[in-house]
Every structure is written in structure tokens, then in C-alpha cells.
């Protein structure tokens, strides 16, 4: 269990077959959050026990080591992509530059970037004005459209951190999202500013090990506001509004807070 921000976070799976009851002593704490998954009817899972099976102890230690190390840029759980596209580009102001065009069926397993940055103001401008745009399989609209800094999980400017899928190291920014496609992936950089920017991008990909049909495309969009909710939902704020099937993988929320300190604890719905 990690201790930080005046709390503890435990990610150890606690399986149960029929029910799970959680109790706490009086004055135990002031805040808690439990995340659980309900499996389809008929699924069999082992009941949790504090006595770990001998073969599970080293596996648990391996996960602990990886999480404690914050990964640091290497995609885990996938073999390294056999193909790497490296591009160094100068993107003039108010222009779009084609970075790479990949033929499918493949999946992108990592995107890494290096951007020369100046002072704090220059960082904030460059990483918000440069946008990553990716279009899969000839679709009419890009599936990925996001300022470069926000795509790698940092705003405003550069804020050093590392986690499982995104972050930054001395070598630059990294994002290890898996992005499958059937026929074609077009990767572009858009400069919404008026100053030319130099960017180095590395795109790692590998062939699909099964047909693309049914996989779905990776989507990443940035916005300040979406459709307003009815008055009885105030002050809720919409992070995502979409239709169809898919999986929600995560969100990077950047708050311009004019009132000083803020816990950042949300009531996500």
C-alpha cells in the first residue's frame, strides 16, 4: 500500500464469489473509495485469503516493484515493436506537417517525443499550441486530436512524472497506449501558434496478432467544455459524451484554479 497525499492506496485484487462486506472501526477515517468489478454470471473466482499461495508471492512482489518504479517509459506486457518510425520536423506556425503514414493491419504501441523548450511561459505555449492528430483507416475525422502536452499527461507546460502508460524522462515524453488499425494510420502535427517549433517523434508499432475486426480504434480528444447539462445537474461538468461501444481508459484533467490550494478530489460519475 502506497502512502501519499495524507492517504493510502491499495491495488491488491480481493476476489469474492458471492458477496463482500467491508466494515471500519469508529473514527477510522474521513475519506474512502472502493473500486470493484462485477463479472458475468457463471464466472468462477477464488475467495481472497491473506495466506498467499507460494507461487503468488513473487508475482505480487514483481507488480509492487513495477508500480513503485513508476515504469519510466517502457511499455509493459507487450513484445517490443519491431518497427520504429523516427521523424525530426520543423512545424511552422499555423501549419500541419505529416509525420508518418503506417500501413496496416498493425498497432502503434508507443509514441515518444522530444521538444526543445525554453522558460516556463515557452513551455506552456509550445505544449498547448502543438497538437497531435492521428487518423485511422481513412475516417472523416481524426480519432486523436490533442495538444501535445495534454496527450502526454502534462499541463500547463512540463511537469515531470512517470506512470504506467504516460510520462516523461530525460529522453522526452512517452505514451504507451495501444492503437490498433486495419489499413492505415496517418500521424500529423498541427501548430496552432505563430512560431515555428522543432519536434522529434518516435512511433513504435508491430503487426496485429489477430484480425482488426472487433478491436476498435483508440480515441483521444481535448476540450474545455462540451454540451451543457440541464440545470438540475449543476455543477456537474461533462468529461466525455459519446455513443456506441468502447472502453473508457482514462482522463487527464487540467484545472485552472483561481482560488489557491485545492485537493483535487473529485466525485466522478
Residue map of PLM features:
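Beta-strand-centric surfaces of beta-sandwich/beta-rich domains
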Residues: 1-269
Amino acid at each position: 500500500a502506497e502512502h501519499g497525499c495524507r492517504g493510502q492506496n491499495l491495488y491488491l485484487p480481493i476476489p469474492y464469489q458471492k458477496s463482500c462486506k467491508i466494515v471500519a472501526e469508529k473514527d477510522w477515517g474521513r475519506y474512502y473509495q472502493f473500486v470493484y468489478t462485477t463479472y458475468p454470471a457463471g464466472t468462477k473466482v477464488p475467495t481472497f485469503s491473506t495466506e498467499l499461495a507460494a507461487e503468488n508471492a513473487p508475482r505480487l512482489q514483481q507488480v509492487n516493484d513495477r508500480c513503485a518504479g513508476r515504469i519510466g517509459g517502457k511499455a509493459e506486457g507487450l513484445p517490443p515493436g519491431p518497427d520504429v518510425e523516427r521523424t525530426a520536423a520543423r512545424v511552422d506556425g499555423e501549419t500541419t506537417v505529416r509525420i508518418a503514414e503506417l500501413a496496416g493491419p498493425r498497432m502503434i504501441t508507443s509514441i515518444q517525443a522530444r521538444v526543445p523548450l525554453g522558460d516556463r511561459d515557452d513551455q506552456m505555449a509550445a505544449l498547448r499550441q502543438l497538437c497531435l492528430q492521428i487518423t485511422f483507416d481513412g475516417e472523416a475525422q481524426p480519432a486523436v486530436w490533442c495538444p501535445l502536452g495534454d496527450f502526454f499527461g502534462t499541463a500547463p507546460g512540463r511537469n515531470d512524472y512517470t506512470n504506467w502508460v504516460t510520462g516523461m524522462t530525460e529522453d522526452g515524453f512517452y505514451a504507451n497506449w495501444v492503437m490498433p488499425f486495419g489499413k492505415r494510420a496517418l500521424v500529423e502535427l498541427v501548430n496552432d501558434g505563430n512560431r515555428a517549433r522543432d519536434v522529434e517523434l518516435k512511433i513504435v508499432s508491430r503487426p496485429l496478432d489477430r484480425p482488426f475486426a472487433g478491436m476498435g480504434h483508440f480515441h483521444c480528444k481535448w476540450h474545455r467544455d462540451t454540451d451543457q447539462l440541464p440545470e438540475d445537474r449543476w455543477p456537474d461538468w461533462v468529461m466525455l459524451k459519446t455513443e456506441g461501444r468502447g472502453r473508457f481508459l482514462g482522463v487527464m484533467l487540467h484545472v485552472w484554479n483561481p482560488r489557491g490550494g485545492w485537493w483535487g478530489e473529485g466525485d466522478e460519475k
